[in-house]
Amino acid sequence: MSIVGRNAILNLRISLCPLFMGKRSFVSSPVSNSAKAVKFLKAQRRKQKNEAKQATLKASTDKVDPVLGRADTPFITRIMAELKEPLVLSKGYNIEEVDKFLAAIESAKRERAELSGLNTEVVGIEDIEKLEDRREAILRILSMRNSENKNAIKMAVELARKEFERFPGDTGSSEVQAACMTVRIQNMANHIKEHRKDFANTRNLRILVQQRQAILRYLKRDNPEKYYWTIQKLGLNDAAITDEFNMDRRYMQDYEFFGDKILIRDSKKVANQKRKEIRKQKRATF
C-alpha cells in the first residue's frame, strides 16, 4: 500500500473517532441521569421524612399553653388535691385546734356538773356521743371542700408561697410571686370556662398572665438557674414566657380553652398550612 493510501485511511479513522465517542456518550448518558434522579428523589424523601419527624417532635415538646401550662403539672395537681382533703380546714384552723376547743367545752361542762352536784359519770357517758357528733359537724363546716372559693384560693396561695419561698415568711421573691399568680390564674381560668360571658375576669386573667411573664423575665435576667427551675415546676417553658402572644379567640381555639368549640374560622392560607402539617406528620409515621 502506498503512502498516500495509508494517510487516507489514517485521516478517515481520525475523522470517525469523534462520531463513535459521541455515540458512546449519547447512549450512556440516560443511564447515568436516571441513577442521579433516583438518588435525588430518595434524598428528597429522606429530607421530607426528617422534617416531618422534627415538626412532630417540636409540636409535642414545645407546645405549652402560655396561660395554663402543661397538663397534669405536679405542683398544680398537688395543691388542688390538698384543697379537697376532708381534714384540710379553712380560715387557718387545723384538727388539733378543733380538738382542743371541744376538750375545753367538755371540761367546762364537767366543772359545772360538779358544782351543781350532778353525777359526772352519767353526764360523761351521754356527752361522749354528742361530742363526737359536734366534732364531725365542726369539721364539715370548716372543711375546705365546703368553704367559699375565696377561702380556698387564699389557702392555695399560702401553700404555693410555702413551697417556693427562699426563707420562712418570704413573700417578695420572684418565684414566690410567680407561683401565687399561677394559682390565681388556674382558678380564674376555671371560672371563665364556666362563665364564658364574664369579660371583666377574662381581661383580668390576661393582665395577670402578662404580669407573670414580666416577673419571670426579670427572674431570668437576675438568676437564670432559679428561672428554669421555677418554670419547670410551674409547667411552663421558655417560649411561654419570652414570646409575645395575645389571649384572644385564636389562642382559645388553638389550645382548646373551651374544648372543641370553634371560635374563629381559618382562612384558606391557614387551613392549607394546617393540612400541610398534618400530611407531614402522617408521612413521619410511615
Swiss-Prot record:
SUPFAM superfamilies to which the protein is assigned, alphabetical: S15/NS1 RNA-binding domain
State the InterPro entries in the record.
Answer: Ribosomal_uS15 (IPR000589), Ribosomal_uS15_bac-type (IPR005290), uS15_NS1_RNA-bd_sf (IPR009068)
Q: Keywords assigned by UniProt?
A: Mitochondrion, Ribonucleoprotein, Ribosomal protein, RNA-binding, rRNA-binding, Transit peptide
Transit peptide range per the UniProt entry: 1-33
Cellular compartments annotated: Mitochondrion
Q: Is-annotated flag, keyword Kinase?
A: no
Q: How is it modified after translation?
A: The precursor is processed in two steps involving mitochondrial intermediate peptidase (MIP) and mitochondrial processing peptidase (MPP).
Question: From the UniProt record, which GO molecular function terms apply?
Answer: rRNA binding; structural constituent of ribosome
This protein's GO cellular component annotations are: mitochondrial inner membrane; mitochondrial small ribosomal subunit; mitochondrion
Q: What is its main location?
A: mitochondrion
In terms of superkingdom, the source organism counts as: Eukaryota
What is an annotated GO biological process for this record, any one? mitochondrial translation
* One matching Pfam family: Ribosomal_S15
Its function? Component of the mitochondrial ribosome (mitoribosome), a dedicated translation machinery responsible for the synthesis of mitochondrial genome-encoded proteins, including at least some of the essential transmembrane subunits of the mitochondrial respiratory chain. The mitoribosomes are attached to the mitochondrial inner membrane and translation products are cotranslationally integrated into the membrane.
Q: Do you know which HAMAP family this protein is assigned to?
A: Ribosomal_uS15_B
Subunit structure of this chain's protein: Component of the mitochondrial small ribosomal subunit (mt-SSU). Mature yeast 74S mitochondrial ribosomes consist of a small (37S) and a large (54S) subunit. The 37S small subunit contains a 15S ribosomal RNA (15S mt-rRNA) and 34 different proteins. The 54S large subunit contains a 21S rRNA (21S mt-rRNA) and 46 different proteins.
* Other facts: Present with 6960 molecules/cell in log phase SD medium.
Which family is it part of? Belongs to the universal ribosomal protein uS15 family.
Q: Per its record, how is this protein called by name?
A: Small ribosomal subunit protein uS15m
Upper lineage: Eukaryota, Fungi, Dikarya, Ascomycota, Saccharomycotina
Question: By which gene is this protein encoded?
Answer: MRPS28
